[in-house]
Amino acid sequence: MVPEAELEQTEAGLVPASSGWFVMNARDARWFDKPKQGHSLPLTGYDEYEAETFFPMLGMSIRVMGPGEPTGTYHWETEQEDFLVLAGEALLIVEGHERRLKQWDFVHCPPETRHAFIGSGDGPCVLLCASSRQFQKDGPWGFYCADETAARYNASSPEDTQDTDLADARFPPSRPMRYREGLLPD
């Protein structure tokens, strides 16, 4: 029988403290303020320890970004990634092309698909992000990419690199935070 996981209450919200099944409301969980990139709820681990210890097979997060805010730096990963727009609108930069997205649009990125999302429209965009972690242990996770189209939206790395510090140098560090009322739609 699979045990129920313990959830630990931190200053920023709930986080898993042991392996097992659990139920956790997104509004009670630990969020991160990502200056110039909106907000993030890493549902399956924020760092390597949490991901490998509690969620070795699947990565999943909720991203909330305002108009003009990228989710991060244009990149590709060795794993499949999938995305669902839960609310609002976004601009997808994929393989150097722009695609407008609206609520309930689903985006599938096979391994090595270069991509980034930018909030658009009149209000916040809520994006569900999911990826496999099956092969990340066998080699590099992926690559940050320099791209003209992504650069127009502050979503490009200055050069192709695997160095997160270099790729994200234009963004202030993320900070853990409690859920802020209004981030998620009712």
State what each model feature region is.
Residues D82, G96-E112:
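Short acidic-glycine-tyrosine-enriched beta hairpin
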Residues S132-Q162:
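Surface-exposed, gly/pro-biased binding rims or lids
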Residues M1-M57, R152-D186:
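A short, N-terminal "cap"/entry segment at the start of jelly-roll beta-barrel domains
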Residues H39-E48, S61-E77, P111:
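Conserved short histidine dyad/triad with adjacent acidic residue
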Residues G88, W104, F117:
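Short hydrophobic/aromatic patches on the structural cores and recognition surfaces of FHA
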Residues M57, I62-P67, H75-V94, S132:
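Short, conserved beta-strand element in jelly-roll/cupin
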Residues L91, P111-D138:
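Ligand-binding loop in jelly-roll beta-barrel domains
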